[in-house]
């Protein structure tokens, strides 16, 4: 492909990927299969690898990249990001409405009523249609510049969709973590023995303040845009018009925004969302009222802290009393024992709550929770049931203090509590409960993502002794699957196909799937990038592991202990024999990989590789592709009809390899 053809194709791919990103992340209406989308992205990555000069800051491939930063820079907002005054009841709303109408000499007023998202306020600055800066609200006048982290949020456009955008525009929105993503994040953190986030807002805030954008990208954040802070080239008459324009430009604007002209309509809307809010996939803690006409907003003005033309109505937090009927123990995939309170069913925040995790023995003792206690509960972030504390004044004397068992409730093995940790663990690596949850973890969405292998199927496979470890999944037959309940021939074929397709998963997914204690998705990716293969990771010593950024002594110990066990090494060997991918599927970290330090030049036309594909394969293994031959070049890969690079390589005595030898080089490296 000629350079001008590559440039045109790269721009075509960017536009196509942006279109599908908008359909998926903003409109929630995809029109393309995941596999086809992935193919487009891979083609663009390959082109930009082969032609680095084609990479642009707003390319979809540049959402996550660069080294972790050392800190955050403070920047000034073009217009202050003021906080909103609060209203907590009907009287407060009536006072606000009266002040507005008095300030406008009883003119007609329309209110835009928006959901009040419980997240992190940010500003996004676009210059000539391209995202150049993102910042937190901070103190309203200045905030922290977090552009690399905000770029990882797929629903934030890197460039505006419609032509004619102003030279400079600063828009405002609320970054949030969806309920499902929050629940999964805390589950993974609990499994890995990490502190839990109290609510989605804290999780979103912590994710945005990561020095490494790669961590932010893994947290599944999203955003709703709610206004324009500054623009130098476009004028709106109403706030609702500005919201419509933002939607046309590709931003996510919440569909539940409404316009009302009377306070009675507003109050009915507030009552509707008092219960309906719990059905949303994200957390809201109230609604926001804004005067719609911008000329009226200007006349009403602002105080030092907040605009006079807007107010935030906040719902009171929901709490309930119930009784602890029992405390049971759950054994996780790493062997950690998690106590769970069985509660008398009670209605709370839109659902019936009957259980709440107590996390560990220390927390039970700290909150003085006993079996039979009356306790006060709420939902952390309107999602996760949490016991706030007991009500000692309501005790009858029949309550029973809880004591952690000394043996595993599943296999009767001895329990251990590692020094310096709050968790208690089953010492038996073959514990049935650990095995079941290890399998469920292995096939989960963030691990090997094998559709159709849910809890019911896993349980049957274990009961019939068809699997004893994750590697056995790859030897299942059609006959064995058809013999399971509710698995017909078609379902069996689909399941076998999903299992076979999962063999091509990345090395990072494989490492995460193994369930190594303290090794989450982020650590798995870092280890995959550093060592390039599962064999390389297994051979690594303590110093090599701790030399990886963010991999401290705790994770290093876990990795060493995991691969020191004969049983785990046998599982890995079975996975290799089954054909599971065990090498890095992405460029190795700088200075690592089998081709680390090797420089390649490509010349001529290859039969089985495009130039972009060959470059990508070299980069995946840690090598480097350059355009000019020099004495520092290690290999010149020779295709048909080579140019002057071949002559220069001969003159300089550089090692020249033809396509068959190049293929042998790649296959030899990837077979270890």
From Swiss-Prot:
Signal peptide: none annotated. NAD(+) binds at residues 34-38, 83-84, 114, 137, 174, 290, 314. It catalyses: NAD(+) + (deoxyribonucleotide)n-3'-hydroxyl + 5'-phospho-(deoxyribonucleotide)m = (deoxyribonucleotide)n+m + AMP + beta-nicotinamide D-nucleotide. Its EC number is 6.5.1.2. The keyword Protease does not apply. GO terms for biological process: DNA repair; DNA replication. The keyword Manganese applies. It is an enzyme of class 6 (ligase). One of its GO terms (cellular component) is cytosol. Residues 590-672 form the BRCT domain. Gene3D superfamilies: 5' to 3' exonuclease, C-terminal subdomain, 6.20.10.30, BRCT domain, DNA ligase/mRNA capping enzyme, Helix hairpin bin, Nucleic acid-binding proteins. Keywords: DNA damage, DNA repair, DNA replication, Ligase, Magnesium, Manganese, Metal-binding, NAD, Zinc. Its cofactor is Mg(2+); Mn(2+). GO terms for molecular function: DNA binding; DNA ligase (NAD+) activity; metal ion binding. Zn(2+) binds at residues 408, 411, 426, 431. The active site is at 116 (n6-amp-lysine intermediate). DNA ligase that catalyzes the formation of phosphodiester linkages between 5'-phosphoryl and 3'-hydroxyl groups in double-stranded DNA using NAD as a coenzyme and as the energy source for the reaction. It is essential for DNA replication and repair of damaged DNA. PANTHER family: CHROMOSOME TRANSMISSION FIDELITY FACTOR 18 (PTHR23389), DNA LIGASE (PTHR23389:SF9). Belongs to the NAD-dependent DNA ligase family. LigA subfamily. This is DNA ligase. The gene is ligA.
């Amino acid at each position: 492909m000629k350079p001008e053809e590559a440039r045109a194709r790269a721009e075509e791919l960017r536009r196509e990927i942006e279109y599908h990103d908008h359909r998926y992340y903003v409109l929630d209406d995809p029109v393309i299969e995941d596999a086809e989308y992935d193919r487009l992205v891979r083609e663009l990555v390959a082109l930009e690898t082969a032609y680095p000069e084609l990479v642009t800051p707003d390319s979809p491939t540049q959402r996550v990249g660069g080294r972790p930063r050392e800190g955050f820079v403070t920047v000034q907002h073009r217009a202050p990001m003021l906080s909103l005054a609060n209203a907590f009841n009907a009287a407060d709303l009536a006072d606000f409405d009266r002040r507005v109408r008095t300030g406008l000499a009883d003119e007609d007023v329309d209110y835009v009523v928006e959901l009040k998202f419980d997240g992190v306020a940010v500003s996004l600055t676009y210059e000539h249609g391209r995202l150049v800066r993102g910042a937190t609200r901070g103190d309203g006048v200045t905030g922290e510049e977090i552009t690399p982290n905000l770029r990882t949020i797929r629903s934030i456009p890197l460039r505006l969709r419609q032509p004619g955008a102003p030279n400079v525009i600063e828009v405002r929105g609320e970054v949030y973590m969806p309920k499902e993503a929050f629940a999964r994040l805390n589950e993974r953190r609990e499994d890995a023995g990490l502190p839990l986030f109290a609510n989605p807002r804290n999780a979103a805030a912590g994710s945005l303040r990561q020095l490494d954008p790669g961590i932010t990208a893994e947290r599944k954040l999203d955003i709703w845009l709610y206004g324009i802070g500054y623009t130098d080239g476009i004028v709106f008459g109403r706030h609702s018009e500005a919201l419509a324009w933002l939607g046309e430009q590709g931003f996510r604007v919440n569909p539940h925004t409404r316009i009302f002209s009377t306070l009675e309509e507003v109050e009915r809307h507030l009552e509707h969302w008092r219960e309906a809010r719990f059905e949303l996939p994200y957390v809201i803690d109230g609604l926001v009222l804004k005067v719609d006409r911008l000329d009226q907003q200007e006349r009403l003005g602002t105080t030092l802290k907040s605009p006079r033309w807007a107010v935030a109505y906040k719902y009171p937090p929901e709490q309930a009393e119930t009784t602890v009927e029992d405390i049971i123990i759950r054994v996780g995939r790493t062997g950690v024992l998690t106590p769970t309170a069985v509660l008398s069913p009670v209605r709370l925040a839109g659902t019936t709550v009957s259980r709440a995790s107590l996390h560990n023995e220390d927390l039970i003792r700290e909150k003085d929770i006993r079996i039979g206690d009356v306790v006060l509960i709420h939902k952390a972030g309107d999602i996760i049931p949490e016991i706030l504390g007991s009500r000692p004044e309501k005790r009858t004397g029949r309550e029973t203090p809880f004591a952690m068992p000394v043996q595993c409730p599943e296999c009767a093995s001895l329990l251990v509590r590692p020094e310096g940790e709050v968790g208690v663990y089953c010492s038996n690596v073959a514990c049935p409960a650990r095995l079941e949850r290890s399998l469920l973890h292995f096939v989960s969405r963030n691990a090997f993502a094998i559709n159709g292998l849910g809890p019911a199927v896993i349980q049957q496979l274990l009961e019939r002794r068809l699997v004893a470890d994750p590697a056995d999944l790859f030897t299942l037959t059609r006959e064995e699957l058809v013999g399971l309940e509710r698995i017909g021939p078609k379902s069996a074929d689909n399941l076998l196909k999903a299992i076979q397709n999962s063999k091509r998963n990345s090395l990072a997914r494989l490492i995460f799937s193994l369930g190594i204690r303290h090794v989450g998705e982020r650590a798995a990716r870092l280890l995959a990038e550093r060592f390039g293969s599962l064999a390389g990771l297994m051979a690594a010593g303590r110093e090599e592991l701790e030399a990886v950024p963010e991999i401290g002594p705790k994770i290093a110990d876990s990795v060493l202990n995991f691969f020191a066990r004969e049983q785990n090494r046998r599982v890995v060997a079975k996975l290799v024999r089954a054909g599971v991918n065990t090498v890095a599927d992405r460029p190795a970290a700088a200075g690592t990989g089998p081709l680390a330090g090797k420089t390649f030049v490509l010349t001529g036309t290859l039969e089985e590789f495009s130039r972009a594909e060959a470059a990508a394969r070299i980069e995946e293994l840690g090598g480097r592709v350059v355009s000019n031959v020099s004495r520092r070049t290690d290999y010149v890969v020779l295709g048909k009809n080579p140019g002057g690079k071949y002559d220069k390589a001969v003159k300089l005595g550089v090692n020249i390899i033809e396509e068959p030898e190049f293929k042998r080089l790649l296959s030899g490296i990837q077979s270890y």
